[in-house]
Amino acid sequence: TLEQGHHKTNSAGVIFAMTLDDAPPPQWPASRRRSSRKPEAEPVWITQLKHAADQFLVRRGKGNTVIAGYHWFGDWGRDTMISLPGLCLATKRFAEAASILKTWAQFVSQGMLPNHFPDTGNRPEYNTVDAALWYVHAMDRYDEATGDLKLVRYLWPVLEDMIGWHLRGTRYHIHADPTDGLLHAGEPGMAVTWMDAKIGDRVVTPRIGKPVEINALWINALRVMDVLVSQEIAVPAHDYIKLAERATTSFERYWNPDTGC
């Protein structure tokens, strides 16, 4: 007999149940019902979000990563770093967050994080300007949530390598402009921001130059580095606050009084 709100399919001895109610279906084993029982003080919707988040946390070799979406997306650098605070830190999965940060650090090349890992197992692609900047942001969120200075010190060389390459220049003409400190990115035929759609060889949204959100991330990354330095992580290779302030001044130089931006 089915209760209201449930749908059951019995095939080869496997029972599937669906419900919007918080209580697990009565057909579930008692051990599963016990393991899924939420803390008394936790709202139902928080528990549901935690369960939904589980499906995106997966393994890559011996480490952890995040699947950008099912069924055809793999793990993407930008998506992984943007989602890490919500998937791992808000849910107190600190060990998995640390594993994700360490896993991706292994694939940093010329200061850049992979855009994504091809499903065919080929070499990762590095055609993104913001994945590395989101990595620095995720590292900052992890530091604030955990106070785990051991991991921060371990990954500090990676962070400095990222910033150093962006200052000197890396793939796709990504470099800090020496005249204003802002980050320039892009070259013909390449789409390196999140607006990365292409039709054949044609870039749908060409954004060669200094995209606004990229430079917001760049300034944030420089300020994060200064915050980490203040925790006596290591002797810095650059004066990060000076770099951040210069870029900030340049960022605010243009103001449109008609639009207020």
Question: What are these model-predicted stretches?
Answer:
Residues T1-C261:
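Acidic, mature catalytic/reactive cores of soluble proteins
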